[in-house]
Amino acid sequence: MAPTPPKDRPNRYTYAQAGVDIDAGNELVRMIGPLAASTKRPGSDAALGGFGGLFDLAACGFKDPVLVAANDGVGTKLKVAIEADRHDTVGIDLVAMSVNDLVVQGAEPLFFLDYYATGKLHVDVARDVVAGIAEGCRQAGCALIGGETAEMPGMYAKGDYDLAGFAVGAVERDGVLPRGDVAPGDVLLGLASSGFHSNGFSLVRRIVEDNRISYSAPFPGGDGASIGEVLLAPTRIYVKAMLKTIRETAAVKAVAHITGGGFVENIPRVLPEGINVEIDGASWTMPPVFRWLMELGGIDDTEMGRTFNCGIGMVVVVREDQALEVSDALAEAGETVFRIGRLIETVPGAARVAVKGALGSGK
């Protein structure tokens, strides 16, 4: 015997009744078309709507290119954006996390694709997110050539969404980083970060929530900016400054993107065995937002250093006699540069990355 259907069951079902609004999706595509078009660069037409995005590598002038690919997300920084109801910066973060991973291998970002998933599509929110993605692409010089918007009823809490990004770049085969001549005595240059970037936000949120602090509250000494605004400062995109410096000086040996794991986990990724790292913690000043969180949560120096960038978002390895030239080139390109340490020969039993003094303790 067949079960008796509920009295409120519709006679005919539609996708919209199941929670998927195709019309809203089409409206979003219409709204973001001009945003994608604003990222056009040689090799792309930056037009959306096809089954796949096209890119003409031959138009970029490479002679013997190697393709480099990266993908990443924004993590739980998205929860801060949702709580603060500000969605126009996390798209920049999304692009930054992938393109910064490309440039550390010497690669020029060429194109980007995004994935936006939510339980219910709110077109205005999604449009703000994509506006940030387009801004990030413009900062990095890459084209937004496609993406996916997934409306999945029942998969996410009300108002939540998730992001993933995918970037592809290219570098001449003989220009791939790190180079093979990284050696003890080389100098480490640190490029200032814009804040937490997109790492460690599960700890940030836990501390803020346990202290019952509103994201709309003013940040102490923040000139009127709210805590949410300070925390949502977008990840700095180092691509154009790094590419210019790499090409003009030919002096960059290796580059590390300082993300989750901090100096301890990220710098060794670009070094050969037999080389250790010595960091002078007093060579730069940790930005106020890090000090604020450190004091609010009682976080010790070790935990700060293995969770956050502590004010340095990228580390560049150069020969000592070329450090000033590279530092000046990066500064001229708009970066704030610190000489933060050096490479030394491995000492048995010593930590791979040793920090003298507290990170960012300079005055």
UniProtKB/Swiss-Prot annotation:
A single Gene Ontology CC term: cytosol
Catalytic activity, EC: 6.3.3.1
Key word Nucleotide-binding present: yes
Functional pathway: Purine metabolism; IMP biosynthesis via de novo pathway; 5-amino-1-(5-phospho-D-ribosyl)imidazole from N(2)-formyl-N(1)-(5-phospho-D-ribosyl)glycinamide: step 2/2
GO molecular function terms listed in the Swiss-Prot or TrEMBL record: ATP binding; phosphoribosylamine-glycine ligase activity; phosphoribosylformylglycinamidine cyclo-ligase activity
Subcellular location: Cytoplasm
Classification via Pfam families: AIRS, AIRS_C
UniProt cross-references to CDD domains, sorted A to Z: PurM
Coiled-coil segments: none
Key words of the record: ATP-binding, Cytoplasm, Ligase, Nucleotide-binding, Purine biosynthesis
Catalytic activity, as annotated: 2-formamido-N(1)-(5-O-phospho-beta-D-ribosyl)acetamidine + ATP = 5-amino-1-(5-phospho-beta-D-ribosyl)imidazole + ADP + phosphate + H(+)
GO process annotations (BP): 'de novo' IMP biosynthetic process; adenine biosynthetic process
Keyword Ligase: yes
Similarity annotation: Belongs to the AIR synthase family.
Name this polypeptide is given: Phosphoribosylformylglycinamidine cyclo-ligase
Source species of the chain: Parvibaculum lavamentivorans (strain DS-1 / DSM 13023 / NCIMB 13966)
